[in-house]
Swiss-Prot record:
Residues 401-458 are annotated as: Disordered. Signal peptide: none annotated. The gene is MFG1. It holds the Pfam family LIM_bind. Interacts with FLO8 and MSS11, both morphogenetic transcription factors binding directly to the FLO11 promoter. Coiled coil: none annotated. GO terms for biological process: negative regulation of transcription by RNA polymerase II; positive regulation of transcription by RNA polymerase II. It comes from Saccharomyces cerevisiae (strain ATCC 204508 / S288c) (Baker's yeast). One of its GO terms (molecular function) is transcription coregulator activity. It is found in: Nucleus. This is Morphogenetic regulator of filamentous growth protein 1. Residues 446-458 have a biased composition (Basic and acidic residues). Transcriptional regulator with a general role in all morphogenetically distinct forms of filamentous growth, namely haploid invasive growth, biofilm formation, and diploid pseudohyphal growth. May control FLO11 gene expression as part of a promoter-bound complex with FLO8 and MSS1. The keyword Lyase does not apply. Keywords: Nucleus, Transcription, Transcription regulation.
Length: 458
C-alpha cells in the first residue's frame, strides 16, 4: 500500500558535518563537530507533492479515499460459475466446480460477464445440443470427424480379418454391439434391371443375418471404401458418406462376387453408429484362375468338361433352336445351355437371384424385416402385460383401428411402411398429405393391405 511521500526527520536528530577539501586537517586525525553545526546547516528541502483527494495535510501519513479503499480490497471467492462454453478447465472440457472463479465487487464488473451480455442472442429454434456444437471451434470438429473416419476404418478392418468367423453368431453379436447403438436402424436396398427391394433391420436381428452368410458357403468378406467423407453436424452427430464402396464375398472353391454400393450413416459422440444406409446398384460374379485349373485337372469331372467344351465349339449351334429362348422370348446366347452347365460347378452361381444374392439369404432378410416391423407389437405386448402373442396381435389390431380415424394420412403411411422414424417409403411419386383429414376404416385397411403386399413381395 502506498504510504505517501517521504517526510524529513525530526529536528532533534543532529545532522552530520560535511567535510570537503577546504576543511583544514585536524592534528590528531579525529573529526570534531562544532557545537553550532546544527545551526549552520540548513534542513533538507523536499519537492512539493500533490496530495490525493482526501489526504490530510500536516506531515502525517495520508489516508486513502473511499474509492481507493474499494480498489484495495481483496477479491471475493464466489461459487457461481458461468456456462460450460466460458468456464473450461485445463483439459478443454467444461468445469465441474473444482476451479473457483474470482469475481470482484460490484463497482468493477467482470469482463467475461460483459462479453457474454454483449454477444448477439442465438436463435430460439436451435436446440441445446445444436448450441453446444455451434460453440465448438473448427479444429475440434475437424478432430472429431477424423476420429469417426478412423473408427470406420477400424470397423472395416475387423470385417476384413474375420476369416473363419463368418458363421459364428457370437462373433457378430459382440462386434455389432460395439459398433451400433441399441436403437440403431440399418437399411439395405438392392436394385436390379427390373425390380427394387428394400429391407430394414434392427440391431437384435442383424447378427443373425451376418452369421447366415457363413451357412451359405461364404468364407471371407472384403470391404473397400473410396472417397470417404466425414463431417460434424450441429445436432452432435458425425455424418459419413462413401459414394463408392464394394463388398466382395469369397467362396471356398475360388469364386467370388462383388457388390458395388453406396453407404452413408451417422455416428454419435461415443463413436457408435446411429443409423446406416447401404444401397447396392450392381454386382459382378467372377472366378479365380486357380479355381478353373482345379476344375480342369479333376479326373472325375474331365468327361463332363469335355462334353461342355464340345458344345461350345459346335459351329452349327446358332442354327439350332434354343428351347429356353423360344419359351421365354428373351435374347440369350446360342450356347447358353453349355454356359449354364459350366456355371453349375462353382458356388457363386448356385441359386443366385437377379439381385446378386442367394435366394435363401433373400428370404432370411425378408423374415428379418418382418421381425423388425413386429418390434412395435412386442412393445405393445409388454406395455399391456399380455402373455399370449395371438391375443396381443388381436388387441394391437383393434387399437390400431380405433386410432386410425384420428391419425393423419402421412402418419398412417409412415407407421405402416416400416419401423424407422427417420425415413419414409412413399416411393418416388408418393405425395405425403400433411393435413388432418380422416379416412374411413375401409380405406385404411386397403392402404394397409397394399403396403403389406409391397413389403412381402419377393
Amino acid at each position: 500500500m502506498y504510504q505517501g511521500p517521504p517526510q524529513p526527520p525530526p529536528q532533534a536528530v543532529p545532522m552530520p558535518y560535511i567535510v570537503n577539501n577546504n576543511t583544514p586537517p585536524y592534528p590528531n586525525g579525529n573529526i570534531n563537530f562544532p557545537p553550532t553545526a546544527q545551526q549552520n546547516i540548513p534542513p533538507t528541502v523536499y519537492p512539493q507533492q500533490v496530495p490525493f483527494p482526501g489526504q490530510p495535510q500536516g506531515g502525517q501519513f495520508p489516508q486513502p479515499s473511499s474509492e481507493q479503499q474499494v480498489f484495495n480490497q481483496l477479491p471475493q471467492v464466489t461459487q457461481t460459475f458461468h456456462n460450460s462454453a466460458q468456464n473450461t478447465n485445463a483439459t478443454g472440457g467444461p468445469g465441474s466446480g473444482s476451479m473457483p472463479m474470482f469475481t470482484p465487487v460490484a463497482s468493477f464488473p467482470h469482463p467475461m460477464a460483459t462479453a457474454a451480455t454483449a454477444a448477439a442472442p442465438l436463435p430460439r429454434s436451435a436446440s441445446q445440443a445444436s448450441l453446444s456444437m455451434l460453440r465448438v471451434p473448427y479444429h475440434v470438429r475437424k478432430y472429431l470427424s477424423n476420429l469417426a473416419m478412423l473408427k470406420l476404418y477400424e470397423i472395416i478392418n475387423e470385417v476384413n480379418t474375420a476369416m473363419g468367423k463368418i458363421g459364428l453368431l457370437s462373433f457378430w453379436t459382440e462386434l455389432i454391439s460395439d459398433i451400433f447403438t441399441p436403437d440403431a436402424v440399418i437399411r439395405y436396398s438392392k436394385k436390379s434391371m427390373t425390380d427394387y427391394r428394400e429391407f430394414e433391420f434392427i440391431i437384435p436381428v442383424f447378427p443373425v443375418i451376418c452369421s447366415t452368410l457363413g451357412r451359405f458357403g461364404i468364407v471371407r468378406m472384403e470391404v473397400k471404401v473410396l472417397q470417404l467423407k466425414t463431417q460434424v453436424l450441429s445436432n452432435s452427430t458425425i455424418f459419413f458418406n462413401c459414394p463408392r464402396v464394394t463388398f466382395v464375398y469369397y467362396y471356398p472353391d475360388g469364386s467370388y462376387i462383388t457388390h458395388f454400393s453406396q453407404m452413408k450413416g451417422a455416428f454419435d459422440l461415443d463413436l457408435k453408429i446411429n443409423w446406416l444406409d447401404v444401397s447396392m446398384h450392381s454386382f459382378v460374379p467372377d472366378i479365380e484362375w486357380n479355381a478353373v485349373e482345379r476344375l480342369l485337372s479333376d479326373d472325375t469331372k474331365s468327361t463332363e468338361i469335355e462334353q461342355i467344351f464340345r458344345k461350345l465349339k459346335q459351329e452349327d449351334v446358332k442354327e439350332q433352336g434354343n428351347s429356353f429362348a423360344e419359351n421365354n422370348a428373351t435374347n440369350v446366347p446360342p450356347n447358353f445351355e453349355a454356359i449354364t452347365q459350366l456355371r453349375s460347378y462353382f458356388d457363386v452361381f448356385r441359386n443366385v437371384s437377379v439381385f446378386g444374392t442367394q435366394e435363401g439369404l433373400m428370404r432370411v432378410m425378408q423374415i428379418s424385416t418382418v421381425m423388425s416391423t413386429l418390434k412395435n407389437l412386442r412393445k405393445f405386448q409388454i406395455e399391456k402385460n399380455i402373455d399370449s402373442p395371438v391375443t396381443a396381435l388381436s388387441a394391437y389390431i383393434d387399437a390400431d383401428k380405433k386410432d386410425s380415424g384420428s391419425e393423419p394420412l402421412h402418419a398412417k403411411r409412415r407407421r405402416n411402411s416400416g419401423i424407422s422414424p427417420r425415413t419414409t417409403t412413399l416411393g418416388p411419386n408418393g405425395n405425403s398429405n400433411t393435413s388432418n383429414e380422416e379416412l374411413p376404416t375401409s380405406d385404411v385397411n386397403d392402404i394397409n393391405k397394399d403396403m403389406t403386399k409391397k413389403k412381402m413381395k419377393f
